[in-house]
Swiss-Prot record:
Lineage: superkingdom: Bacteria
Organism annotation: Burkholderia cenocepacia (strain HI2424)
Protein name per UniProt: UPF0301 protein Bcen2424_0864
Cited Pfam families: DUF179
Similarity field: Belongs to the UPF0301 (AlgH) family.
Length: 192
């Protein structure tokens, strides 16, 4: 058994699904890991937009959104856990404090309270954010086991991929951080 100091912390990393990903929920996905510890991991899928946009979601929760550039931003499928709950991955806002925020190593924050959406609606919230419904979760040791079985590649996250890259390009862009493309990947693992 490894000592806690030997553990690799994958917080602020991308998980990139390998071609042999057994779970169709995660096939072709890039997951931003918000938290990884000996208790498990929590992440958000960043490349699966839904057919819901911000205007529709804000109407559902009785918030008025009149900022034209934001109306048609998609809400993302963040993962299969708590799919009715919103998770906002965003850059910190100087002087702002939200009711339920978690700072992520690397400078981003994840907020689950409605006050961040209220701030977005009034133009005082984060300028760069990604809103998901649901999240991905792993129990203690589960993610490490999936990585060992060649289910995921990992690489340090780049906020430009989260916020500035079109959703359909995020998978290839994340692979590009490793110097590879999807055409170079194989679902087979082996040892030399």
């Amino acid at each position: 058994m490894s000592k806690p100091s030997d553990r690799i912390n994958l917080t602020n990393q991308f998980l990139i699904a390998m071609p042999n990903m057994a779970d169709p929920t995660f096939s072709g996905t890039v997951v931003y890991l918000c938290d990884h510890s000996e208790r498990g991991a929590l992440g958000l899928v960043i490349n699966r937009p839904t057919d819901i946009d911000l205007e529709s979601l804000f109407n559902r929760i009785d918030l008025k959104l009149d900022i034209e550039p934001l109306l048609h931003i998609p809400v993302y499928f963040g993962g299969p856990v708590q799919t009715e709950r919103g998770f906002v991955l965003h850059e910190p806002v100087e002087g702002a404090s939200y009711n339920s925020s978690m700072s992520v190593d690397g400078g981003l924050e994840m907020t689950t309270s409605k006050d961040v959406l209220e701030a977005v609606a009034t133009g005082t919230g984060p300028k760069r954010f990604l809103l998901t419904l649901g999240h991905a979760g792993w129990g203690a040791g589960q993610l490490e086991e999936e990585i060992a079985r060649n289910g995921w590649l990992t690489v340090a996250a780049d906020p430009r991929i989260v916020f500035d890259t079109p959703a359909e390009e995020r998978f290839e862009a994340a692979l590009g951080l490793l110097g590879v493309s999807s055409s170079m990947l194989s679902g087979e693992a082996g040892h030399a």
